[in-house]
């Protein structure tokens, strides 16, 4: 038993899609979440900057005495997950491998689509993981740089969002039977994406798939929390507007949440 919280980090609100799944599958676990919305999206940024920012988020979570870290951001996973995993003595999960495995299991035609940020797509990380596990699969990757900003600005139900998704997804329509949502922001656009791609296309939420691996590792390392839900804690931090984050978080999680603003430079300087 280990009653310490699980730490989640993301470039903004996207990682809440992973938290929602964790709360569904493992409702007794405590959570600390940090979203770097002030510097979102990470996707267009250079790798060195993404690495620096992600390490700041990791260091912040370590000050909260977390027992495990979930990098709930595909871009950060692509750039720095391996390095962080090797550097820490607690389990560190990324979201790419679970999403890749689920896509392989889902696809019948062998035609898999992947959408993500420019950095995730240019890194080729999904294609590499999928091909390593199943060389016969054909992977079609598409960068969708306008999706994460729509989510961060809470415009997911707008006509603009529908137009952008329709225009962006056109190259993949009728070409794949499985589509990996290779950014944790994208499940918030899931209804629109599904409508554009058609009901026959299976959408893979890489973040939700990751929670299954969280459960496996909790058991393996015997660091599950005692199943007393009443004593669990949830802390949510953002580097940007508390109100903006809170609005999206409450819509997505379906409950009231308390959000705190954090200045990472000051927080880590004082640590």
From Swiss-Prot:
Gene name, Swiss-Prot/TrEMBL: murI
Q: What residues bind substrate, as annotated?
A: 10-11, 42-43, 74-75, 184-185
**Xref: Pfam families:** Asp_Glu_race
Family as reported in the entry's similarity comment: Belongs to the aspartate/glutamate racemases family.
Q: What is its EC number?
A: 5.1.1.3
**BP term (GO), one:** cell wall organization
The species this protein belongs to is: Streptococcus thermophilus (strain ATCC BAA-250 / LMG 18311)
A single MF term (Gene Ontology): glutamate racemase activity
State the protein's name.
Glutamate racemase
Please describe what this protein does: Provides the (R)-glutamate required for cell wall biosynthesis.
UniProt cross-references to InterPro entries, sorted A to Z? Asp/Glu/hydantoin_racemase, Asp/Glu_race, Asp/Glu_racemase_AS_1, Asp/Glu_racemase_AS_2, Glu_race
* Keywords carried by this UniProt record: Cell shape, Cell wall biogenesis/degradation, Isomerase, Peptidoglycan synthesis
The answer to whether UniProt assigns keyword Cell wall biogenesis/degradation to this entry is yes
């Amino acid at each position: 038993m280990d009653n310490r919280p699980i730490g989640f980090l993301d470039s903004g609100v996207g990682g809440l899609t992973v938290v929602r799944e964790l709360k569904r599958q493992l409702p007794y676990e405590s959570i600390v979440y940090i979203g770097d919305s002030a510097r979102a999206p990470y996707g267009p940024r250079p790798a060195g900057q993404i690495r620096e920012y992600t390490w700041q988020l990791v260091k912040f979570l370590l000050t909260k005495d977390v027992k495990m870290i979930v990098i709930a951001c595909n871009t950060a996973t692509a750039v720095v997950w391996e390095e962080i995993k090797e550097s820490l003595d607690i389990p560190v999960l990324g979201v790419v491998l679970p999403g890749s495995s689920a896509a392989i299991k889902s696809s019948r035609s062998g035609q898999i689509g992947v959408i993500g940020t420019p950095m995730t797509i240019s890194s080729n990380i999904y294609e590499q993981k999928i091909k390593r596990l199943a060389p016969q699969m054909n992977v079609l990757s598409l960068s969708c740089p306008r999706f994460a900003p729509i989510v961060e600005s809470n415009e997911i139900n707008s006509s603009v969002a529908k137009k952008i998704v329709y225009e962006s997804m056109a190259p993949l329509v009728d070409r794949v039977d499985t589509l990996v949502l290779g950014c944790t922001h994208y499940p918030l656009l899931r209804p629109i994406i599904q409508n554009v791609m058609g009901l026959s296309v299976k959408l893979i939420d890489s973040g939700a798939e990751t929670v299954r691996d969280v459960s496996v590792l909790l058991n393996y390392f015997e660091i599950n929390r005692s199943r007393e839900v009443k004593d669990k804690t949830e802390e949510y931090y953002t580097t940007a507007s508390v109100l903006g984050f809170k609005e999206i978080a409450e819509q997505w999680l379906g409950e009231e949440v308390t959000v705190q603003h954090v200045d990472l430079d000051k927080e880590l300087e004082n640590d």
